[in-house]
Amino acid sequence: MIKKASLLTACSVTAFSAWAQDTSPDTLVVTANRFEQPRSTVLAPTTVVTRQDIDRWQSTSVNDVLRRLPGVDITQNGGSGQLSSIFIRGTNASHVLVLIDGVRLNLAGVSGSADLSQFPIALVQSVEYIRGPRSAVYGSDAIGGVVNIITTRDEPGTEISAGWGSNSYQNYDVSTQQQLGDKTRVTLLGDYAHTHGYDVVAYGNTGTQAQPDNDGFLSKTLYGALEHNFTDAWSGFVRGYGYDNRTNYDAYYSPGSPLVDTRKLYSQSWDAGLRYNGELIKSQLITSYSHSKDYNYDPHYGRYDSSATLDEMKQYTVQWANNIIIGHGNVGAGVDWQKQSTALGTAYVKDGYDQRNTGIYLTGLQQVGDFTFEGAARSDDNSQFGRHGTWQTSAGWEFIEGYRFIASYGTSYKAPNLGQLYGFYGNPNLDPEKSKQWEGAFEGLTAGVNWRISGYRNDVSDLIDYDDHTLKYYNEGKARIKGVEATANFDTGPLTHTVSYDYVDARNAITDTPLLRRAKQQVKYQLDWQLYDFDWGITYQYLGTRYDKDYSSYPYQTVKMGGVSLWDLAVAYPVTSHLTVRGKIANLFDKDYETVYGYQTAGREYTLSGSYTF
């Protein structure tokens, strides 16, 4: 059975690995309840991706990392840097909470959903990904799941890397972490990435004029962190990063008007924290500030022309979290405060606005014999829509040694974004979107196979839709999502296998029509092995049929997009103990497919890279 001490000492060895790239159940995660705990004690399905996984996959974007994970469906308007959406278990892209080191991603407050095509892969040291409701812990947005991107580096040393590939792709990266005495360490990183790209849009989706040009992407990134241990229990940190991106895209063109087809994004974030890590009590206080400027403009006229748009947001947050060990588990409590300030014109609002939110939450985890219980409750006080409460509860029963049944229920919500509230078509009387979710799961270890199978249902109400007749946003939509998820990982001799299957039936509960851009079925398979010092990896992904809208003519028609099977091949060779050379072929069989109707994907792509560590 699961050892009770595992909840106290974070050193359990159990069968329950919850499908992760790092398959050790001892892996510590912080996202589930904001404090470190073994992944095996988290009842929600959880995936952990390490930097070693990212290097082995040779991913050049965050989207390429996330697309491999269970329950994730990513759509993108073309290649690198183009607009993308993350759907988790069939929910809307705006129903995914994206955190950077536990702090809400700033830009999501403007658009209502996180576009991770712009976030630099160089900053990602690990990813913790939890499926299911988490609003009772984090507040708004956590309906489909939570993605926590962690930038903290674990190992000291210096790495220099470079890569080249198809479509004139090039990447140069330098990072270092140095120990200053016994108690202080400094981390620095600089990254440059550029691709000429390709023409992403077929004629018809850009108005009356084709735009046969390359739609490229350029990103420059800087990162710095200082960490200091004052005593064995007290520590603190200061951290900051910024990136400067330029994206060329194909836009809808009206004759006689400027062609707005270039995006320039400036983003910077700073945070500082103080932590206490005692034997029974843990506490942390974190403050953060982030500022983003997102321009869209015609390069012939520049960013400051009247035809250009600017979305600008400043975000301030304070988080105070506490955790105490009680019995064979723990209790946590904390307060979140957030202020978002927008400039005039952001998200087409007529004036600048401030929005404040204060959340108070309580979490608990306890083991009683063969049973594990988890619960959370939260109350948010928002300056726009007032108070809103959420809660969730889960129970796990190890009915046979190595086999567990889990049942859970949770509520969650999504606050209306600033454009929906205050934009030209906005409605300041909007309520939050609300969700009720149920899930049942079995998991275990059978003949060396770590497996989990779960079924879930998610009813979402008060969805915010645009009314063509009144030209306003209203809470009038409903969605009903049912799904099955199965995951497994196992070894056969020198081969390591990781596989997942997703079936998602996501429908408009009023019209009973499928929700757009969600694949009904997905199969994902990762095979890794080593042969004569070469590390090989094969990635397979099947994307099932999905529906979308054809916007090339009015009235817009619903179109059905066929499924596709995709293969990637990656290989790495350690030339010396310091120098590693890597190569990859993505979309090995050059499949022609789209995830957004009318926006082409890249086809077969090659990359070659090398890294030197010392």
From Swiss-Prot:
The keyword Protease belongs to this UniProt entry's keyword annotation: no
Protein name as catalogued: Vitamin B12 transporter BtuB
Binding site for cyanocob(III)alamin: L83, S85, N92, V110, S111, A251, T309, R517, Y551
Limits of the TBDR beta-barrel domain: 155-614
Annotated membrane topology: Multi-pass membrane protein
Organism annotation: Shigella dysenteriae serotype 1 (strain Sd197)
Disulfide bonds: none
One Gene Ontology term of the molecular function aspect: ABC-type vitamin B12 transporter activity
GO cellular component terms, semicolon-separated: cell outer membrane; pore complex
Limits of the TBDR plug domain: 38-152
Top-level taxon in the UniProt lineage: Bacteria
Motif (TonB box): 26-33
